[in-house]
From Swiss-Prot:
<dbReference type="GO" id="GO:0009399">
    <property type="term" value="P:nitrogen fixation"/>
</dbReference>
<dbReference type="GO" id="GO:0046872">
    <property type="term" value="F:metal ion binding"/>
</dbReference>
<protein>
    <recommendedName>
        <fullName>Nitrogenase iron-molybdenum cofactor biosynthesis protein NifN</fullName>
    </recommendedName>
</protein>
<comment type="pathway">
    <text>Cofactor biosynthesis; Fe-Mo cofactor biosynthesis.</text>
</comment>
<dbReference type="InterPro" id="IPR005975">
    <property type="entry name" value="Nase_Mo-Fe_CF"/>
</dbReference>
<dbReference type="InterPro" id="IPR050152">
    <property type="entry name" value="ChlB/BchB/BchZ"/>
</dbReference>
<dbReference type="InterPro" id="IPR000318">
    <property type="entry name" value="Nase_comp1_CS"/>
</dbReference>
<dbReference type="GO" id="GO:0016163">
    <property type="term" value="F:nitrogenase activity"/>
</dbReference>
<comment type="similarity">
    <text>Belongs to the NifD/NifK/NifE/NifN family.</text>
</comment>
<dbReference type="InterPro" id="IPR000510">
    <property type="entry name" value="Nase/OxRdtase_comp1"/>
</dbReference>
<dbReference type="Pfam" id="PF00148">
    <property type="entry name" value="Oxidored_nitro"/>
</dbReference>
<feature type="binding site">
    <location>
        <position position="44"/>
    </location>
    <ligand>
        <name>[7Fe-Mo-9S-C-homocitryl] cluster</name>
    </ligand>
</feature>
<comment type="function">
    <text>This protein may play a role in the biosynthesis of the prosthetic group of nitrogenase (FeMo cofactor).</text>
</comment>
<keyword id="KW-0479">Metal-binding</keyword>
<dbReference type="GO" id="GO:0065003">
    <property type="term" value="P:protein-containing complex assembly"/>
</dbReference>
<keyword id="KW-0535">Nitrogen fixation</keyword>
Amino acid sequence: MAVLTHSRRALSTNPLKTSAPLGAAMAYLGIEGAVPLFHGAQGCTAFGVVHLVRHFKEAVPLQTTAMNEVSTILGGGEQIEEAIDNIRKRANPKFIGIASTALTETRGEDIAGELRAMQVRRKDWVGTAVVHVITPDFEGGQQDGWAKAVEAIVAALVPVTAERDPDLRQVTLLVPSCFTTAEIDEAVRMIRAFGLSPIVLPDLSTSLDGHLSDDWSGHSLGGTRLDDIARIPRSAVTLAIGEQMRAAAPMIEDRALVPYRVFQSLTGLKVVDAFVRVLMELSGMQDPPPSTKRDRARMMDAALDAHFFTGGLRVAIGADPDLMFALSTALVSMGAEIVTAVTTTQNSALIEKMPCAEVILGDLGDVERGAGQAEAQILITHSHGRHAAAALHLPLVRAGFPIFDRIGAQDTCRIGYRGTRAFFFEIANAMQAIHHRPRPEDFGAAPIPQEFDHVPHPAPC
């Protein structure tokens, strides 16, 4: 059981955490025809847009209420109403997701109450779903903002149902913030292989997967349809991936009587096997499909090939709790050792389940310091960790958000049998790529072992 330790430094160096409003915005972008709206200053939104555009390499429709000195003091209700009007006129969205920021939450504004009054008064807003979530920058991180946004979407858009009328082939898939678009695709592929039809919430795999559109649009292109969210009560079960989705799943059960299963991770043999067993149970299959069996056999072979490099490997990792837990447990199952673990938020039950003695709530400065002291051999974190990797002369495996110095970050897959196989290869290849540079002390300057320290005598004739 890991112990959570708070970093006791007077400043943050090279931050690891991404803010909660940005996590909420990413969840909103997984809804079809959506426009995320930050209730705060223009700079908050501009900074978020830069992060999203650099990571996904796509245009992102992120809007702001543009709070100024006067509206911050007197209240920003008028700003919200004006922003929604402008967005509806210019982008014609089906969904507007509002995320508060540190500015408005520090003031203590009753955004939810103001929004309810607006929706009663503004009958012309009919046809545009508006959802609000409280996400101050100073509380939690990206994972927390994503989870709160999903919970708000469920509370606002999933109908309350008194009686069950399930479609036994339909399942609801709640995905975590750490899933890439390729990982959502892989989870959907695995579910469909068993003859099941998933409703993904939120679905970034069809909105931020990097596809060309014929026309420009001011809202998200793709994502979970509002009609599909309304059909969630007919699902046979809710499959929640990641500890961050543990609160949203029972909300669906309370509203629509849909049972749920929570999977803390989908990276590694045991957890994927457990996921497949549930899919077999839901589909009524006695054996997995041949393609699934083949994927499992390939993953097992990859584990055999990679264990020469992962056995005894000393790993330093910095990530959100769900991603940190998923990658760490998979590596420990391959014989690696987590010597440094730094995370972004304390709001996760997975922290104490980490396969290490200590988890630090800190930044990349803590990652660099801990990795150096523990003599780590590899570093796993997002692109901002490249400075620590260079300083320590360690290979860097980029994981998490943001990844801006590589193209195709959204196409990385580390879940399921296929993704776990790719992850093992990724780690092994990162270690193989380290080239040893000979130094003088490796040769003549090195001490000679005592058993070889002797004067040779000529052999008698």
